[in-house]
């Protein structure tokens, strides 16, 4: 069963200038990401490269463009196990995703989440990680699986971080 998610809807200028623009206008709760207004849900479903924000070892924010996925009320972050961001996520499991409409930078969704668990591709049930990677490969490239960007020099293994959504902010219109 999907969890309730708090949504903060920022006021924007799509309908003209207004008092308090760019501040939070309305708040609501929805059940799962499927409960988002369609103008924001569309951003999640399109092959838009997100910006992932996380805290690096020096305490500064690290921003990484990457692919993402979601299922119900969980965000899925799939990365190679040998990458630095994998260790940073393990050290501080609080993440922020920003999904900006490439056709209108004043239309975006921000998702703050916390890693609940990780799935390892080399674990007995690791085929879940591979299937999810193949799914986003097709979403973002249009190519049939398998995922075609594995590092050929190493035996690259993947990690799937399953994240609970803490809150969502929305802004603008398409």
Regions found by a protein language model. Name each.
Residues 1-35, 107-174:
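Charged, gly/pro-rich active-site loop segments
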Residues 22-54:
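Short, conserved active-site entrance elements at the starts or edges of catalytic domains
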Residues 36-38, 63-64, 82-84, 147-149:
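A generic local structural motif
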Residues 43-46, 105, 157:
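A short, polar/charged loop/turn motif at coil->beta-strand junctions and beta-hairpin connectors
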Residues 44-45, 90-91, 154:
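Alpha-helix boundary recognition
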Residues 47-81, 87-89, 97-100, 108-111:
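Short beta-strand segments
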Residues 100-102, 165:
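Short secondary-structure boundary segments
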